[in-house]
């Protein structure tokens, strides 16, 4: 256990020590809650990037995809799409479509994902700026704000959502054949190298 997670615990202790020394409010409940809430989006992006790296690829456009899908969601809500969950689903579909575009381009062109996603990163960010007119978006419904500000069982909704997604992905990659098969091509790549060299 320590060999696997020791580095994480050491870093957490170092952050806690320096955070406490810099501010007396660092380890307060409110501050820790805000850290988890603000990190929930990063965690979701990281889980998506995890799969890209798992298959020996990389996606540099995850931030741009988040921005564009988020902007589409915001525009749908401001356009009167109700309930707001429908707008959220629309944003998720846009994000999935953008990811599919990346995958198709990598597959069709044969170029490295680094190059493809570097280009689509700029394209997606440009589209986001056009849609938003380079301005912030505000004026969301109270239902939307109240939903994500809720704290059932004392846990913020964004944190709960991140935990649910993490559990689903953990189950997928460790308990289902389709998930374990993702590991196989990468895990055994080194075993094919001697054969290639001999041929």
Model regions and ranges:
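Conserved small/polar residues in nucleotide/adenosyl-binding loops
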Residues: 189-195
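Hydrophobic core of alpha-helical transmembrane segments in multi-pass integral membrane proteins
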Residues: 11-18, 163-168
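Single transmembrane alpha-helix segments in multi-pass membrane proteins
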Residues: 13-21, 25-80, 104-111
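Alpha-helical transmembrane segments in multi-pass membrane proteins
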Residues: 10, 14, 44-45, 69, ...
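Membrane-embedded alpha-helical core segments of multi-pass
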Residues: 44-48, 68-69, 97-101, 124, ...
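Transmembrane helix-bundle core of multi-pass membrane transporters
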Residues: 109, 113-176
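N-terminal membrane topogenic signal
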Residues: 1-8
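Alpha-helical transmembrane segments within multi-pass membrane transporters and channels
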Residues: 81-121
């Amino acid at each position: 256990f320590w060999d696997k997670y020791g580095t994480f615990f050491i870093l957490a202790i170092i952050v806690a020590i320096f955070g406490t020394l810099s501010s007396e409010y660092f380890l307060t409940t409110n501050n820790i809650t805000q850290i988890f809430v603000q990190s929930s989006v990063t965690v979701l992006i990281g889980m998506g990037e995890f799969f890209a790296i798992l298959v020996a690829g990389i996606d540099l456009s995850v931030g741009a995809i988040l921005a564009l899908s988020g902007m589409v969601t915001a525009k749908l809500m401001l356009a009167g799409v109700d309930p707001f969950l429908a707008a959220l689903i629309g944003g998720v579909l846009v994000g999935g479509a953008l990811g599919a575009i990346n995958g198709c381009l990598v597959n069709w062109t044969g170029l490295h994902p680094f190059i493809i996603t570097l280009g689509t990163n700029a394209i997606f960010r440009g589209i986001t700026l056009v849609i938003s007119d380079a301005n912030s978006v505000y004026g969301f419904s109270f239902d939307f704000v109240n939903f994500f500000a809720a704290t059932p069982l004392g846990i913020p909704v964004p944190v709960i959502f991140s935990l649910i997604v993490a559990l689903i992905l953990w189950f997928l990659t460790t308990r289902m054949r389709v998930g374990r098969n993702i590991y196989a091509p990468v895990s055994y790549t080194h075993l094919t190298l001697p054969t290639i060299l001999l041929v």
